[in-house]
């Protein structure tokens, strides 16, 4: 199916490329005219273009002259002139496509064209990079073009506080990483004050290394969370010790391909004996199974120095695609805690989700989206299906002459590594630069050790040395350089033969004390001379390295994705330079062992001799087959993640929009009055027991429960007399009108006491508090639902359809609870006892936290943390910049109707189950035997988890009360 889509997509490429060529011709036709302009005339182009846009001209009409202007400014400030193919790439980006341009073709410079053009509209342009260093470096270097033309340039980096972030977002052009942009969006939707907002919309984004961000990281949702209730760290430590006593294949099974484990009968017996329990699979022990599975996964599937490193007592995840450390990220669902217990470091508390969004849904919010990469064509169908982005391959400026050799395959890793060292020694002896790509930190260190033994000087670039990656990559093309890199971690910095001129010039100026931030004028003044000086130094060495064959790229094993391999190969042969690449494989490599057992068997049958490799097209083809199988599986995972997130996205999109309206001061008084009416009607319907006759209603229960929400002054006997002759809907309406009228009168008295302005502010802040709290609980329940929804497939039901259906029901129930709790809090605050609105809100919070009718999970402390959690045991990412106020506000979701600025339930308000008063509001009866009256406890169960007894209550509200 994907192949058919690929062919269909390519059918229109010729027409698109012709349009791009026409743009390049139009820009070239203006070159002489623009080149003749003075610096002042060039600077005047920006206000001229803005005026033309205001007068009705489209960006497409302005594009040729705007591109020509940027090209001329680039020549004057950077000494770089955009090639025709770069002009074509710029047009492709402006029209909302992915420009596939090979490594070394100057993608960073290409982005300046559409970035400037779209920034003229004054709505902001976001340029998205893969790490903070590149965001900072590119904003400095390319910012010289923008600043010359009168544009403001901002850069978002991890350490910045909200006021600084707001300033950066208000710039015409803002650089930053995908995670920073995404987290700021989530934090904005947790803010309690308009002044706390930092972003100003999502107009146009250009994503650098778009395949890495929108494909490789698409399985990883961004999540802001804080510590959950309860301390269960002892269970992780206990199970870490327990699994050391278990034996693989005897006590448990491991499927490395699918990354799943299964406990066998002998293992179950050992676990039960160790824990002193009779039956591991009793409902009371449900939580223990999760600890056991995670402990086995930590032991067998997650390896130190491959999947993670341990630094200063902390477990840090290594990105499987780039080899970089992912600071602050954590595996989800208790897996990270299991690894911490395995390594004997501090086991940190589990987290509870406050706000979440996938990268897929975040980037689909932009009015226009574009991207750049050297390797997108293999995923063209996915880009179109998910993001509506076409992929346009842009030809290279000079013909590619790199030699890509067939793979060499050896029997064992030991034989392969010996051959690699021999090959590197030969290349190094003649001075040819060599780049060795490895798939893990562990592998890079093994190769480094062997090179040390062979006395071959080299640089290592892996997750443990990620701080110096750009500096190492910048000199990796110099004569005699040998660089060992994990999955080519330094993407974004070109490997130029002889050295990277711009990087070396920038480094020289900074070493002399000049920088764009601190001394911008001196930096600009000295840049041309320093650049020419470095160019002269590099030129001779560049020619010498070309004569030696250019950069030799040696892959020590194949990655699961063809794109990662192509990215490694793409480091060589830039801008028409010579180069060579080859991959060394062994039958023991993970890809071969797990995904192509048939090929391994065929090769073994040929009776390979020790140290003797096989070099054949069939081997390379077999590897590609294995890679396609993995890519197909990963694509299905990403599609599945998106399908499930789309359910939440519909709720999240509406409520975030409505929440922003409340935050920005819209009057919600009418909504509060509607909340009062809806809540009263819901209680009446819950008390009528399905009977149309008022005499059969539970009047005592109704007024007792209703008074916990609205302390009504209406007399029960009087109401019963008034509705005595009415039936059905008319009776409900009559009772509702009487109680609502009384409630409105009380509410009016409240307004007289606190003042109209004070009450409006109180309403806004109470609504935000309740929305955020209920949304947090809703996220928790939705996570729990998703965790177990796959089992519905065993009952011949579609898990996704079930998730949509039950998620919608839970969502509507949440809306009812939001209305009810908002009304309850507003009516239970003692306005006469508080002097200010702030004090009133404080009392509201205290009331909310102490009332036994409202379930409030604990939020983060003053150092609230944000995390990127992932589906299927991917990763989480922390952000310690969340301040205390944001940490309290835990995001909300709901649905809107008409012009209302607050959530309402769907087409028809959902009534409470079984025609009764809501569970949380029913009168407590001394005679009623509670589920937890049997005195049992269920060790290891989280406080917010459903109680294993089956009552449907959270553990802390059920048998958890028996814990001392």
Curated annotation (Swiss-Prot):
Superkingdom of source: Bacteria
Major subcellular site: membrane
UniProt GO MF annotations: ATP binding; metal ion binding; protein-exporting ATPase activity
GO biological process terms on file: intracellular protein transmembrane transport; protein import; protein targeting; protein transport by the Sec complex
Region (Disordered): 848-964
Cofactor(s), names only, from the UniProt record: Zn(2+)
Protein name per its UniProtKB record: Protein translocase subunit SecA
High-level lineage: Bacteria, Bacillati, Actinomycetota, Actinomycetes, Bifidobacteriales
